[in-house]
Amino acid sequence: MSIKSGFVALAGKPNVGKSTFINAVMGRKVVIVSDKPQTTRNRINCIYTDKDSQIIFVDTPGIHKPLHRLGEYMVKAAVQALKGVDLVLFMLDAADGFTKTDEHVAKIVNDSGTKTIIAVNKIDVAGEEKAKAVGELAKSMVENVVSVHYISALKGEGVFEVLEKIKEELPEGPQYYPEDMVTDRPLSFMAAEIIREKIFHLTRQEVPHSTAVVIEEIKDRPNGVLYIRANIYVERDSQKGILIGKNGSMIKKIGTLAREELEFLVGRKVYLDLNVKVKEKWREKDFIILQEIGLKDDIK
């Protein structure tokens, strides 16, 4: 039996709602979200499967003007994700209006030459008139647009219609992944992302963006507990102090929230061992960015 299947890359500036859209489609949290820009650093394949289709959503870092080497690699990963896919889902933020960054992303999307669906997000915040103005501007800059949609990813409004349009545009093809698989990323990656999400939720200003989480060890203990040891890298001693908190209060809070979500993910008890370490200017160092964080897998 043939199904509709293929790869759909999400493109847009930071904090436009790409990860929220994917989680809404999946009906569960697969990728981390926060209200801060540049939460997503790596390219992540999220796999949606139903009785007549399999859609592999390629969630990418937001395209922005990079301020450091990490940012350069993030943008490179996002741009490269648009190549070799069946569709691009170009997302915009209605509340922001059509910005210079949106214009930059539109040019990149247009240059990819790939069939494009435009989704203007946050219509519940901006209102229909402002959202439609954004959608029309975006459409005027991208040649290969097949449809424009106005949605609220957070509330799930319009998400089903976008999903149905994606299915309509995808070719018939094979089932690429088992039907119970929701991402192609390993547990170590998911664990690091969950820890990083809690840091984004609980800290402010430059601290979350200056943080890298590296899983050093995952092993089963004889008592059935899953042991996970992670290093959290920051760039300055002051950031380390904030992450640890008074009498260890902040790192304990991060650890508790991350552990609870990890236990839900793996379905058993987890012992989470977190260590905060200083690596000065790690965002400028290729080895950490490419090897430790894993962006080398996103850049061909």
Curated annotation (Swiss-Prot):
One of its GO terms (molecular function) is small ribosomal subunit rRNA binding. It comes from the Bacteria. Its main location: cytoplasm. Residues 121-124 are annotated as: G4. GO terms for cellular component: cytosol; plasma membrane. InterPro entries: G_ERA_dom (IPR030388), GTP-bd (IPR006073), GTPase_Era-like (IPR005662), KH_dom-like_a/b (IPR015946), KH_dom_type_2 (IPR004044), KH_sf_prok-type (IPR009019), P-loop_NTPase (IPR027417), Small_GTP-bd (IPR005225). Residues 12-19 are annotated as: G1. Keywords: Cell inner membrane, Cell membrane, Cytoplasm, GTP-binding, Membrane, Nucleotide-binding, Ribosome biogenesis, RNA-binding, rRNA-binding. It is found in: Cytoplasm; Cell inner membrane. Residues 151-153 are annotated as: G5. Residues 4-172 form the Era-type G domain. It is a peripheral membrane protein. One of its GO terms (biological process) is ribosomal small subunit assembly. Residues 59-62 are annotated as: G3. GTP binds at residues 12-19, 59-63, 121-124. Residues 38-42 are annotated as: G2. Signal peptide: none annotated. Residues 195-280 form the KH type-2 domain. It holds the Pfam family KH_2. HAMAP family: GTPase_Era. PANTHER family: GTPASE ERA (PTHR42698), GTPASE ERA, MITOCHONDRIAL (PTHR42698:SF1). Monomer. Belongs to the TRAFAC class TrmE-Era-EngA-EngB-Septin-like GTPase superfamily. Era GTPase family. An essential GTPase that binds both GDP and GTP, with rapid nucleotide exchange. Plays a role in 16S rRNA processing and 30S ribosomal subunit biogenesis and possibly also in cell cycle regulation and energy metabolism. This is GTPase Era. It comes from Thermotoga maritima (strain ATCC 43589 / DSM 3109 / JCM 10099 / NBRC 100826 / MSB8). The lineage of its organism: Bacteria, Thermotogati, Thermotogota, Thermotogae, Thermotogales.
